[in-house]
């Protein structure tokens, strides 16, 4: 298993992958969490679908003064200079990351990504499903589901 990686999670405001409204980042070194970062982000396009608000609880008022992904990149870019990226349902998070980088005209070589959902299906047998909250319950990991930092932490710990 990987011992050094960055676990990520994004929450979006609507169906567009560039509509990031929250990011959670957890740095794992030698199998231990060494750093955590989370931030609200002003989504592009700037509108919220009620269905998405109901899922994560983030409202337009909460992000109206937040930085854009582009403006935040100067702070978060270093977290992506890592051996690997880990996420639960990594296909979603990686597509969001790539779309946001492209929209911001940022050309970044990303490391290999690993999906804890896919890994768990291979390694953990007998669960009713492989949703993040189910896995966290199984492993005794506290999770505030659909809060980006908590989801990144859960994905990082489920990787162990």
Language model: regions and residue ranges:
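Conserved beta-strand -> loop -> alpha-helix junction used to position metal-binding or nucleic-acid-contacting
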Residues: 107-120
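Acidic, divalent-metal-coordinating active-site segment for phosphoryl/phosphodiester hydrolysis
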Residues: 148-160
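Conserved non-catalytic scaffold segment of RNase H-like nuclease domains
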Residues: 1-110, 125-146
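Short Asp/Glu-rich motifs
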Residues: 72, 120, 155
